Amino acid sequence: MSENTLQGNATISIHAGEPKEQFGAVVPPIYQTSTFEYETTFAAAEAFGDLHTTNAYTRLHNPTNTVLEEKLAQLEHGKYAVTFASGMAAVTGALLALLSNGDHAIFVKAKYSGTEEVTTKYFPKFGIEYDDFDPLHMEELESKIKPNTKLIYLETPANPTLVMADIEEVCKIAKRHGIKVAVDNTFASPINTNPIDFGVDIVIHSMTKYI
C-alpha cells in the first residue's frame, strides 16, 4: 500500500518500496522462486488463506514485484498497484474486473489497437456492450450513458494519434451517474499527469513506453 509522501518523483522512483536489505545491497534482489518457505504448516496455511497480501506464490506476490508496485502506486498518487506480464494483460485484467455480462462501457474513439481488439473481438463473447465517443465533442459522452453503464475508459494522449481527453470533465460526468473511470496513462506518464488527482478510479500503463 502506498504511503503519503512529500518526496519528489526522482526519489520515489529510486527508493520507494525498497525494504531494508539484510546485506546492505543498494539494488533490490531479484527473487526467482515460485513458492516460499514457512516455519510451520500453520504459517503456510495462514499465508495461503490471505493470498492478496502475503508472499505465498510468485504469480500472485513476489518481493521484487512488490518493490515495483509500490513505486508505481506512489508515482500515480494511488493506494495500490498490480503488475502484469504486459500492458494488454493489465488493460484486459482491469476491464474484466470491472465489467460483467450485461454491463455497458464507453470508450474514447481514439485508442490503442490492442484495446480496440478487446472491445470488438472479445466483449461480444462476454456479453458486454460498449460505445465509443469523441473526446473532442464532450456532449457525445453523456448522450451515450445507459442505465447499465459501469465504466468510462480514456486513453490520453491516445496512442498513436495523441488525441487528448478532458479527464476532469469526464470524471465530473461519471460521478454524477455513479460510473467508474479508467485511464490508460501510458503516453503521459505519471511525470506529466496523475489522473487519480482528477477523480479517476484506475490508471493503467504499458511500461515499455515512457516509464
Regions inferred by a protein language model and the residue ranges of each:
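Conserved PLP-enzyme active-site core in the AAT-like
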Residues: 2, 15, 19, 80-211
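N-terminal "arm"/small-domain region of PLP-dependent enzymes with the aminotransferase-like
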Residues: 2-62, 70
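Short, hydrophobic/aliphatic alpha-helical segments
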Residues: 8-12, 69-74, 199-201, 205
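Short, mixed-charge, low-aromatic patches
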Residues: 22-30, 46-50, 75-78, 96-99, ...
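A broad "ordered helical/assembly scaffold" signature
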Residues: 27-30, 39-40, 54, 65, ...
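Conserved N-terminal alpha-helix of the aminotransferase class I/II PLP-enzyme fold
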Residues: 40-89, 114-121
